[in-house]
Curated annotation (Swiss-Prot):
Its EC number is 4.2.1.2. It holds the Pfam family Lyase_1. It comes from Brucella suis biovar 1 (strain 1330). GO terms for molecular function: fumarate hydratase activity. There are 2 substrate-binding sites: the catalytic A site, and the non-catalytic B site that may play a role in the transfer of substrate or product between the active site and the solvent. Alternatively, the B site may bind allosteric effectors. This is Fumarate hydratase class II. Belongs to the class-II fumarase/aspartase family. Fumarase subfamily. HAMAP family: FumaraseC.
Length: 463
């Protein structure tokens, strides 16, 4: 039987594993919430470490916390930030809606680790108490939403933005490489007027640049922190100036520019800032879905599809059809986008549940937002590295489809009129003849004028 030690809380004593830093409230949560396997996301755990370190430093600065105790709390909290204590955060997302159990998990782990650093006895709560010292000037009600904002901002800046830039650059390379390849455009999935393959890829690249702009705009409110509102937004038990000092400390720790929220009542009860930001993630997912679909459809074949693009062959595609290779990176990215669309609904419903002074769907908001950031980041890097970088144009197929298209007739419309041009296209389609043959047979245009007007290279920009 594994060794245990006895920890206590207001409900009395309880045994916890001797080699774990968590205490009584974490252990009770493990026993009371045996629901699923979705652990609290590690970026959120690390953000709680930031909260506890920043609170300790601010309490020291304001003369509330003994500097000796505060400094060792900061050391233990830094270990949480660095991921050294990840194994000591076992709780699932499905717990109290305020995130109190996870906040106490952080308080207990940091308390016991700090006691250990001072040579004391774990579980004694002496000389560092999880509530009185680690949680000083705080409530779960302001600490947990603050951690959500910190984790969201840090993950976005350090993970999502680099991944988005990586894919954008990969598309830009192809845009330049394909700039002189003229192909048939398509609207409503039907033939339209010509574009260059580079122009098509420029649309993908620009979509991601606009997505980055929307993300940056919506992230601005995420940099506003609830800390200092304590239980209901009034700031009870937090000293004057704690909120501003705390935000400055978080900025110093993370290297990002955080500020205290001007209205703590809104910050505790509403999660509009995070919902709005996830809306930008949702929009990015929609763009990625479109890009992935376009590329896999343009690469369909190899003998019976559009076949304008050759996609990298990364792995066998079928357990029954020998030699089959599938557009797996595009499929993975569209599944990620689908998950993000679902997360958007979950975050929307959760953010609407701010009853009176507190929203009590905080953990599920954190889980879905951070999952979306992680999945989008990973899939963009994977799609860039294993798909986009290896895309090659099938120029012969592109030329064949361009020359067969009846929509080149659009170039004749200014000269012979829309109705006449439409009749020529319909006749060619009905008879299985070429556009050129029917145009000349109509007597409406000479061979010389047809060859002058119907030139794909003159149809890809204003003339």
């Amino acid at each position: 039987m594994a060794a245990t030690r006895t920890e206590t809380d207001t409900f009395g004593p309880i045994d916890v594993p001797a080699d774990r830093y968590w205490g009584a409230q974490t252990q009770r949560s493990l026993q009371n919430f045996r629901i699923g396997g979705e652990r609290m996301p590690l970026p959120l755990v690390h953000a709680l470490g930031v909260v506890k370190r920043a609170a300790a430093e601010t309490n020291i600065a304001l003369g509330k916390l003994d500097p000796v105790l505060g400094q060792v709390i900061a050391v233990a909290a830094s270990e949480v930030i660095e991921g050294k204590l990840d194994d000591h955060f076992p709780l699932v997302v499905w717990q109290t809606g305020s995130g109190t159990q996870s906040n106490m998990n952080a308080n207990e782990v940091i308390s016991n680790r700090a006691i250990e650093l001072l040579g004391g006895e774990m579980g004694s709560k002496k000389p560092i108490h999880p509530n009185d010292h680690v949680n000083m000037s705080q409530s779960s009600n302001d600490s947990f939403p603050t951690a959500i904002h910190i984790a969201t901002a840090v993950e976005t800046v350090n993970r999502l933005y680099p991944a988005l830039e990586h894919l954008t650059k990969a598309l830009k390379v192809k845009e330049e490489a394909f700039k002189d390849i003229i192909k048939i455009g398509r609207t409503h999935t039907q033939d339209a007027t010509p574009v260059t393959l580079g122009q098509e890829f420029s649309g993908y690249r620009a979509a991601l640049e606009y997505a980055r702009h929307r993300l940056e705009q919506s992230l601005a409110d995420v940099f506003l922190l609830a800390q200092g509102g304590t239980a209901v937004g009034t700031g009870l038990n937090a000293p004057v100036g704690f909120d501003k000092g705390f935000a400055e400390a978080v900025s110093e720790i993370t290297g990002l520019s955080f500020k205290t929220a001007p209205n703590k009542f809104e910050a505790l009860a509403s999660h509009g800032a995070v919902l709005n930001f996830h809306g930008s993630l949702n929009a990015l997912a929609a763009d990625l879905f479109k890009i992935a679909n376009d590329i896999r459809f343009l690469g369909s074949g190899p003998r019976s599809g559009l076949g304008e693009l050759s996609l990298p062959e990364n792995e066998p595609g079928s357990s029954i059809m020998p030699g089959k290779v599938n557009p797996t990176q595009a499929e993975a990215m569209t599944m990620v986008a689908t998950q993000v669309f679902g997360n958007q609904t979950a975050v929307t419903v959760a953010a609407s549940q701010g009853h009176f002074e507190l929203n009590v769907f905080k953990p599920v908001i954190a889980y879905n937002v951070l999952q979306s950031i992680r999945l989008l980041s990973d899939t963009m890097v994977s799609f860039a590295d294993h798909c986009v970088e290896g895309i090659e144009p099938n120029t012969a197929r592109i030329k064949e489809l361009l020359e067969r298209s009846l929509m080149l007739v659009t170039a004749l419309a200014p000269a012979i009129g829309y109705d006449n041009a439409a009749r020529i296209a319909k006749t060619a389609h009905k008879n299985g003849t070429t556009l050129r043959e029917e145009a000349l047979a109509s007597g409406l245009v000479s061979e010389e004028d047809y060859d002058r007007l119907v030139r794909a290279e003159r149809m890809i920009a204003p003339q």
